[in-house]
Amino acid sequence: MGARLVRGRRPVDAGVGLTPQPWWFGPQELAPPGDEAPFDLVLLDRDGTINVRIPDGYVTAPEELLLLPGAADGVARLTRAGCRTVLVTNQRGVARGLLSREGLVAVHRQLDALLAPAGGRLDAVVVCPHEQGACRCRKPLDGLFREALSRAPWARAERCVMVGDMPSDLEPAAGLGMRTEQVSAARDLAEVARLLVPSVRGSVVQRGEGHVP
């Protein structure tokens, strides 16, 4: 069966050229944060944590990406605290031919544009583009988290935190010794960020290169 059409767009070739490895968008090696940062890494889920999840579907174009309430303020608070932030996301729509690598980059450029006015920034993005069972990185497996740690050799798992909305986001991080925090309709990312960073001093800390190619 070929890739199916989504909202009138032509499908890309499903899974063509995929290897079992995750996709990393960012510096080859992340620079460590300053001494003031409360965590080595803050790992953030995407759909349902930062942006509105599309029921039974995928964000396949920039205009479909809608921020959840509190998301921009939450990421901005983490940025001001000097945290290194890494987006950790399953995107099976790639394997199903619903968007290409370039299409995913365009979606994440839009995410950057939506976060920037509040002062938020992501330092890197790590993606599982695979179908279930085709890799070791699709959450709830821990490959995405291991990839993030490998790109930050100075980071210790016990000084990292994962924020997500689903048990599949949190369980692999906890298994590696990371702290976990769950967002929900009653507890948005801004509230979780205030818990993680009770006070923020000064202005935005100078950041790394960012993740956009």
Task: Indicate where each model-derived feature is located.
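Active-site neighborhood of HAD-like aspartate-dependent phosphohydrolases
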Residues: V6-R84
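Active-site flanking residues adjacent to catalytic metal/cofactor-binding acidic residues
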Residues: L44-R46, T89, V163-D165
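Active-site loop/turn elements of alpha/beta-hydrolase fold enzymes
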Residues: P55, N90-Q91, A185
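Gly/Ser/Thr-rich helix-start
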Residues: T49, V94, L98, D165
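Substrate-recognition element of Asp-dependent hydrolases with the DxDx(T/V) motif
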Residues: A71, V75-H108, R121-G133
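Conserved protein kinase catalytic core
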Residues: N51-R53, R96, E171
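Asp-based, Mg2+/Mn2+-dependent phosphohydrolase catalytic module
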Residues: G2-D40, R101-D123, Q132-M162, M166-P213
